[in-house]
């Protein structure tokens, strides 16, 4: 397999490309920008495309994928596409309809990976972020093991080739893994992960269970208000990353991406900028030394850009535990 399409084998036998293209964009970015960016990513060599119902862009991402299939650049089986189940569809009876809705938006027959996006359940309905008249989130109480059983049925129906989770902590992963009658383990846990939050303990736990850790916000974060603290440090300006970038004649972003690949983490790179999209593919062209890796390990300072604290309160809020 050529280096551009390096893959990791998942615990269900499917393969996931280790470098993925993230399609999330802040609200002010026009949704149709996702068409051009996704096409550019596929042309540049990305084969793993990550989106979600929450991002409101699946029809555009699907359009881009289908146009690259139509023009002969790729076949459907070359693309590894991830979607995610949003919190308002955790009740088991809503899981398959939510996936079918994503597939309809995408105009695809299946997704390669379907994830439970976040472990806190919200009130079912059309509203993605349902609130009461005082602006308080409207939560729901759902047993995530029941949600997981509905996810397993989606895999059995062929609507999703693989199933996994996102933003789960160790306790929540164990709850699924220890579920009586478990049919399929989650293939991955997609979490925020970068040199300032390197998730060492969660990574070791996932590896011990043959669950792949997938890193989002691997380059820091989009810094979107109101989600991200505007005073948080900018990862890509870190002196250690900048020094390593200079040493390897690469960008700090490439150093941050390469770091994840070398520790066995699948990494998502989000950019709508053509030059940076192409640049990010160069992560396969160089290697960091063990000293480089140690230096980056030393940057860990437990800085979480996406605390999602509007979801704090319910027992399923994942970020109160150590990991």
Swiss-Prot record:
An individual GO BP term: bile acid metabolic process
Q: In which pathway does it act?
A: Steroid metabolism
Residues bound to substrate: 24, 117, 222, 227
**Where does the record place the catalytic residues?**
55 (proton donor)
What reaction does this enzyme carry out catalytically?
a 3alpha-hydroxysteroid + NADP(+) = a 3-oxosteroid + NADPH + H(+); a 3alpha-hydroxysteroid + NAD(+) = a 3-oxosteroid + NADH + H(+); (17R,20S)-17,20-dihydroxypregn-4-en-3-one + NADP(+) = 17alpha-hydroxyprogesterone + NADPH + H(+); (17R,20S)-17,20-dihydroxypregn-4-en-3-one + NAD(+) = 17alpha-hydroxyprogesterone + NADH + H(+)
Query: Site (Important for substrate specificity): which residue positions?
Result: 54
The subcellular location is: Cytoplasm, Cytosol
Query: What Pfam families does the database record attribute to this sequence?
Result: Aldo_ket_red
Q: Per UniProt, where does NADP(+) bind? A: 20-24, 50, 166-167, 190, 216-222, 270-280
Name the Enzyme Commission number(s) assigned to this protein.
Answer: 1.1.1.-, 1.1.1.112, 1.1.1.209, 1.1.1.210
Query: Site feature Lowers pKa of active site Tyr: at which residues?
Result: 84
Q: What is its main location?
A: cytoplasm
Recorded GO cellular component terms are: cytosol
GO MF terms here are:
17-alpha,20-alpha-dihydroxypregn-4-en-3-one dehydrogenase [NAD(P)+] activity; 3-beta-hydroxy-5-beta-steroid dehydrogenase (NADP+) activity; 5-alpha-androstane-3-beta,17-beta-diol dehydrogenase (NADP+) activity; androstan-3-alpha,17-beta-diol dehydrogenase (NAD+) activity; androsterone dehydrogenase (B-specific) activity; bile acid binding; carboxylic acid binding; estradiol 17-beta-dehydrogenase [NAD(P)+] activity
Q: Which Gene3D superfamilies match?
A: NADP-dependent oxidoreductase domain
Sorted keywords for this record are:
Cytoplasm, Lipid metabolism, NADP, Oxidoreductase
Q: Which domain of life is it from?
A: Eukaryota
Q: Which of the seven top EC classes does this enzyme belong to? A: oxidoreductase
Q: What is the tissue specificity?
A: Expressed in liver, adrenal gland, intestine and kidney.
Tell me the function of this protein: Cytosolic aldo-keto reductase that catalyzes the NADH and NADPH-dependent reduction of ketosteroids to hydroxysteroids. Most probably acts as a reductase in vivo since the oxidase activity measured in vitro is inhibited by physiological concentrations of NADPH. Displays a broad positional specificity acting on positions 3, 17 and 20 of steroids and regulates the metabolism of hormones like estrogens and androgens. May also reduce conjugated steroids such as 5alpha-dihydrotestosterone sulfate. Displays affinity for bile acids.
Protein family: Belongs to the aldo/keto reductase family.
Question: Subunit structure of this entry?
Answer: Monomer.
State the protein's name: Aldo-keto reductase family 1 member C1
